[in-house]
Curated annotation (Swiss-Prot):
Known catalytic reactions: ATP-dependent breakage, passage and rejoining of double-stranded DNA
UniProtKB keywords: ATP-binding, DNA-binding, Isomerase, Nucleotide-binding, Topoisomerase
Stored CDD domains: HATPase_TopVIB-like, TopoIIB_Trans
HAMAP family attached to this UniProt entry: Top6B
GO molecular function, one term: DNA binding
Signal peptide range: none
Organism: Pyrococcus furiosus (strain ATCC 43587 / DSM 3638 / JCM 8422 / Vc1)
Subunit: Homodimer. Heterotetramer of two Top6A and two Top6B chains.
Record's protein name: Type 2 DNA topoisomerase 6 subunit B
Swiss-Prot/TrEMBL GO biological process terms: DNA topological change
């Protein structure tokens, strides 16, 4: 039998970078087409986030050069705020690092993996460092070649050059060389990804230079820079014991009371006083009550707000226990124990709080959705709905918005899925957006067959924490609150589509009736001329006036082709 020491000879600590190097598929690097799209996605989302946080209208240029079979150079340049020199190795070479991952704030990226994952993918497929050119608008441009030390999860600058910046250029340009990828104009390729990005970000000017040198421009259709999202404090209903314990031990506040009031939303001094009573009641129930049925009844009464009655049911003991808990609230937060953090969270679950604030959410907006869909897809009809903010899992705010575009240059149906304005191109089958759209009975809204209709449905889920199904961030988990909000938004937009189509069909019917009458009018006039002796022209004029007075047609939105097809 082998000894324990022999078994552990191969024991090794693996860094985050090393883990993802071996499991790149978890980040979306799977398949030649998807891998290239993922590289572009990570770079473009970084650019858009940086521009918006700095209050800059984004200009993003993507160039793809073919170097060989399944071998490309990818260049992404933006006009953002630039990256300070000291942060270059951290931004591009350290996983789980960034300006957003640790904050309760809406953003396109939320894990701190994105662009460093792209750098790592380039490194393990081509062996080349990523070239970064950046300036914050000062008198220097920094050019650096970055690699990742996967064992240490650290960025390493292998070469650096500084250039003068007389024109005060500001922005960032990155160049990655990647292999085992392929550029195609498919629904999962780079072109389609950038097209969908332009729809959801009408304030951005996006350019794509394809491998054959063709330039494609998605011009901005809005000059309004989205307001930067605001960091929001966590809500008591959305935290776990570890959250409270970790936050308390990092807090600079003088007491647990001040920590709770200042670092959580919807908690005031009065609410802390109430929290003390709930913790005291739970302590008494756990200490004094052995009968499980009675224990369940008392906890149910707490959930119904009867905390004072429950406390008094224990006689004089309750005041002493309340004093014990009050002492916890006055001690330094770094001395909060795990058990005390557990008690706080258990009490939170039973207490009633106002819904978390949603001021930090930044939806695209109905007007901008309509602008984006109209400028890129050129439909005959477009509408958008932005639902009021809601919460899921007790305390995480989110918001749903929907756009519908119909007809015009649209030839087939599409579901455009977004999370915080970012297109989701893959794993559609497991996404709550797909299931919500498919659950709608579109025939009720004058769309006989969704799959065959010239109809595009856009759904954007906005949240400080989008519940993705995996680290690849391409599919949103099926959460009831989100599913229901998507359905409500879809039905509201679909009712507007039905009203438009109803009016269109009525106009079409009237035009067809008029054309039928006009078609047979010469024969009717000739016959009446023979019977009455009245001149044919006079009879024609009479009936034309009669037709005009009886059939009023507003032809807006109805093409001649549609009329002719209807007659056939």
């Amino acid at each position: 039998m082998a000894e324990a020491r022999d078994l552990f000879k191969e024991f090794k600590v693996q860094s985050v970078s090393e883990f993802f190097r071996r499991n790149a598929a978890m980040l979306g690097y799977t398949g030649s087409i998807r891998s290239l799209t993922t590289v572009i996605h990570e770079a473009v989302t970084n650019s858009l986030d940086a521009c918006e946080e700095a209050g800059i209208l984004p200009y993003v240029r993507v160039e793809i050069e073919e170097l060989g079979k399944e071998h490309y150079k990818v260049i992404v340049e933006d006009n953002g705020p630039g990256i300070p020199e000291d942060y270059i190795p951290h931004v591009f070479g350290k996983m789980l690092a960034g300006t957003k991952a640790h904050r309760n704030i809406q953003s396109r990226g939320q894990q701190g993996i994105g662009i460093s994952g792209a750098v790592m993918f380039a490194q393990i497929t081509s062996g080349k460092a990523t070239r970064v050119i950046t300036s914050t608008g000062d008198d220097e441009i920094v050019e650096a070649w970055v690699k990742i030390d996967v064992q240490k999860n650290e960025g390493k600058i292998v070469k650096k050059i500084k250039h003068p910046n007389p024109k005060r250029w500001r922005g960032t340009r990155i160049e990655l060389e990647v292999k085992n990828v392929k550029y195609v104009r498919s629904k999962q390729g780079v072109y389609w990804y950038l097209k969908l990005t332009a729809i959801a970000n009408p304030h951005a000017h996006i350019e794509l230079v394809e491998p054959d040198g063709k330039l494609i421009v998605f011009p901005r259709s809005s000059e309004d820079i989205p307001e930067p999202p605001v960091e929001m404090k966590p809500h008591p209903k959305g935290v776990m014991t570890d959250d409270v314990y970790t936050m308390a031990h990092r807090s600079k506040r003088s007491t647990v009371r001040r920590f709770l009031v200042s670092e959580f939303s919807r908690i005031s001094d009065k609410k802390v006083d109430e929290l003390v009573l709930y913790i005291a009641a739970l302590r008494l129930i756990n200490r004094e009550v052995t009968d499980q049925n009675l224990k369940s009844q008392l906890i149910e009464r707490l959930a119904n707000g009867e905390v004072e009655k429950v406390l008094k049911s224990f006689g004089r003991k309750w005041k002493k226990v309340v004093e014990e808990v009050e002492k916890i609230m006055e001690k330094p937060p770094e001395k909060l124990t795990w058990h005390e953090a557990e008690e706080i969270v258990e009490a939170f679950k039973l207490m009633k709080f106002l819904a978390p604030p949603t001021y930090g959410l930044r939806p695209i907006g109905e007007e901008n959705i309509e602008k984006g869909l109209s400028s890129i897809l050129r439909p005959e009809f477009v509408t958008a709905v932005t639902r009021p903010p809601k919460v899921y899992s007790g305390g995480i705010p989110f918001q749903v918005e929907v756009g519908i575009a119909y007809g015009g240059e649209i030839t087939n149906s599409e579901i455009l899925r977004y999370a915080n304005r970012v297109p989701l191109l893959f794993d559609a089958g497991s996404c709550v957006i797909t299931s919500a759209v498919r659950s709608i009975d579109w025939r009720r809204y004058r769309v006989e067959s969704f799959d065959n209709a010239p109809l595009v449905v856009l759904v954007n889920v906005v949240s400080v924490h989008v519940p993705y199904t995996s680290t690849g961030k391409q599919s949103i988990a099926s959460i009831d609150e989100i599913y229901n909000e998507i359905r409500l938004a879809l039905m509201e937009a679909a009712r507007r589509l039905a009203a438009y189509l109803g009016g269109k069909y009525r106009r079409l019917y009237q035009i067809r009736r008029k054309k039928i009458f006009e078609k047979y009018l010469p024969e009717i006039a000739r016959s009446l001329h023979i019977l009455t002796g009245e001149p044919e022209e006079k009879i024609k004029e009479y009936f034309l006036r009669l037709i005009e007075s009886k059939i009023t047609v507003a032809q807006e939105g109805v093409s001649e082709v549609e009329v002719e097809e209807g007659e056939a």
